């Protein structure tokens, strides 16, 4: 091919200029708007279906995820059985359930809570009259009416509870009153004080006022032994919380539910029949050996001397010889 020969360009189709009609632009705008409206309606319907609450038995979640209601309790409720819609009933039950458990939990706590005169306040000011939260006053009233002095074994229970955070037997044994002499002597001394109303007693005074009366002998021993807690609810704590929440729900007319704590307390609020599973440890394995059926409003307690689930293990200690220590003093 000659250098001077010109390269042939491919033949291109001739360009044609087309003018768009301006007649249908308003119609197009209307169609686009209608399409957007239809899409918005479909999206809203989809969201409505997602947020729709179905009637029937459902777990009621706490409004606050960092709360006693979501960490230690389960509330199942028959939504829509009353006059309210399932969604409205779910919201009202959840708000009341969460609020009562939060307030009662703070009142019964042995940790300082800003602006709350709770159990911690009472323990830090023995022999003083203190106006406390109504929930704390009610808890001591319940124990007094029941003739229970379990709350006064708090120092012993506090030492015993330390056993369950241990990893090795050598650590655990120093908190075990059955295996360690010093721990046994401490437990015996605290038990003697706990049984004696002249040594320690919570007095119920008017206007939600409590006085934690502690004898001079007990105060001296507490100072020498590093005891700062004279009263605490221990394993009764969740029972008191469960009753407080259940009573509040019933008083507000919400009775279509069952409230239970993870450590074995339960309250049925209505006449529905419900079942309680019975477990037994056989040859190192956990087996469901039966079911107990109940009907009508009832309060139930189910304790186990062994861990049944992986999450249970933090509340028990198993020695290398196979002995299981449960969280209940006897």
Model-inferred region functions:
Residues 2-330:
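Mature catalytic core of soluble alpha/beta enzymes
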